[in-house]
Design a protein with these regions (language model features):
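Short recognition patches in nucleic-acid-associated and regulatory proteins
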Residues: 73-91
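Catalytic center-proximal scaffold of phosphoryl-transfer enzymes
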Residues: 1-47, 95-98, 102-480
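Short cysteine-rich clusters marking metal-coordination/redox-active sites
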Residues: 67-70, 100-101
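Short metal-coordination and nucleic-acid-contact micro-motifs, chiefly zinc-binding Cys/His arrays
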Residues: 56-66, 80, 93-96
Length: 480
């Protein structure tokens, strides 16, 4: 059995051109011969792409052969090859260069109509696939998969995909507004006139570490997630999801602007409540300041209890009693009781009593360390001193966690831990011996967060009119 595939090009005047596509032949029906093979499908798509591109470019060239003002034919100065990388193969287009007509003044003597229209050598569709896939998996694996499923007649290298991703991400960076010290606009009188806002926004920020190149060690990546409680005008079937963001702290020059744009994309108003949860680091907290007049900055309970848990584990290793004879006194039970008391006071936001208890604990451990010379006691003393310093620096950000918990309010940023794992670890750390430059990691994170937020396709629609027209179908959520 033979198959012949034809493609018919119909011009605006109704004239038809028939183009023969690669013929197919089938004999006995077998599972392996059922339908088209991947190689045949790629070959057919490549041929169709070539015919469609030839007809499109020929129509564009014909529209510019005559002067639009006087109608006289333009002289051809020459032709040059215009290579275009598409999803269905690399195509070399013959691009003529026309001489401008003398009936009107022009800035240049000649022009190339195709070069003016096709300013980039990679089509948006292929560029979208390269950047989206490489944000979810390694550059090398992206090149292999694209080569496997698309009719690529020339090798696709990981370095090419990395360069394309960095160029596209840099375009995003150039669109980002200028950094500001404060993004609060207006006054209370103006804010009172605003419509009722949506539900509170909860923003959690944490950090992760990525291995640097050229023996530079590791550098920190700040990642976070913003959750909207509810939307007033949301439909019953509308599902509210958080938006993640990330940046390399030592490279990014606009961290506050970046976070503000994420919040604004979720409908942030100046009269809307915003809660920021962080680990208490100064660099992280500075990013959150002066973004909203209704903002509340809280210390993440997870980081508080994590430090206390370490102290409790260390306290179990200190001697039960210190001294001999009449001077002997209990240490371990007393220390454990003091730590539990400190945790209770911190849970209820009573930092004054917690600090007093910490000072008492330090005095007891200092005396015990001098009497026993025990290593665990000294280690516990150092940990208690560090905890006291931590609480003193962040005491104004320690709320009544118990009351918030009973009211159903967030006290910990567990959702941020999953965001850091999703944004950073899955692509850049776990099970992959990757080394990164700060610029390369930062630019990749900008693409990855937009892909995970399901905003990347809309970005390409804004850049390239006609790219993937919007349909009523719900987008498929990314799992990686």
């Amino acid at each position: 059995m033979n198959f012949q595939i034809r493609i018919v090009a119909i011009a605006d005047n109704g004239q038809e051109q028939v183009h023969e596509i690669t013929p197919l032949q089938r004999t006995e029906l077998k599972p392996a011969t059922l339908g088209l093979t991947l190689a045949e499908g790629k070959a057919i798509l490549g041929e169709i792409q070539r015919v469609v591109v030839e007809q499109q470019t020929a129509h564009c060239v014909a529209a510019h052969r005559r002067c639009s003002a006087c109608g006289q034919p333009r002289h051809t100065k020459g032709n040059h090859d215009l290579p275009m990388r598409t999803v269905f193969g690399k195509i070399t287009i013959q691009s003529p260069r026309f001489v401008h007509c003398d009936c009107q003044p022009h800035e240049t003597k000649s022009f190339s109509p195709l070069a003016q229209v096709l300013t980039e050598r990679t089509t948006p569709e292929l560029l979208f696939l390269e950047t989206e896939w490489s944000s979810l998996m390694s550059y090398g694996l992206t090149a292999e998969l694209l080569q496997e499923v698309l009719p690529m007649d020339s090798p696709l290298h990981a370095s090419t995909i990395r360069e394309h991703l960095c160029n596209v991400a840099q375009r995003l960076e150039n669109e980002l507004g200028e950094e500001q010290w404060s993004f609060i606009e207006g006054c209370q009188r103006d804010w009172n006139k605003l419509p009722p806002p949506d539900g509170p926004l909860t923003v959690g920020i944490d950090g992760g570490y990525v291995r640097g190149r050229n023996k530079e060690g590791h550098f920190e990546v700040i990642a976070g997630k913003s959750l909207l409680a509810f939307r007033r005008e949301a439909g019953e079937e509308e599902e509210l999801s958080g938006k993640c963001f990330a940046f390399v702290q030592t490279y990014d020059e606009k961290p506050k602007r970046r976070l503000f744009e994420v919040l604004r994309s979720q409908g942030l108003q100046m009269n809307q409540q915003v809660e920021f949860l962080s680990d208490g680091g100064e660099d992280v907290r500075n990013v959150q300041l002066y973004l909203n007049p209704e903002a509340e900055h809280l210390l993440d309970w997870f980081h508080v209890t994590m430090r206390l848990t370490v102290l409790l584990q260390t306290a179990k290793g200190v001697p039960e009693k210190i001294g001999e004879g009449e001077e002997q006194y209990e240490l371990r039970p007393k220390v454990l009781k003091q730590l539990e008391s400190i945790k209770w006071y911190l849970w209820h936001g009573n930092t004054f009593q917690a600090l007093n208890k910490l000072q008492d604990l330090e005095m007891d451990l200092d005396a015990a360390a001098c009497d026993s010379k025990d290593e665990n006691t000294r280690k516990l003393l150092k940990g208690a001193e560090e905890l006291r310093t931590y609480v003193e620096r962040n005491q104004k950000f320690l709320p009544n966690y118990g009351e918030r918990y009973r009211n159903g309010e967030r006290i910990a940023s567990g959702f941020v831990e999953s965001a850091v794992n999703q944004v950073v670890s899955k692509r850049m750390v776990k099970h992959q011996q990757m080394q990164w430059t700060q610029r390369g990691a930062h630019l990749l994170l900008q693409i990855r967060t937009r892909v995970l937020n399901e905003e990347w396709e809309d970005t390409f629609r804004r850049w390239y009119p006609g790219f993937r027209p919007q349909t009523q179908e719900q987008p498929v959520k990314k799992a990686a």
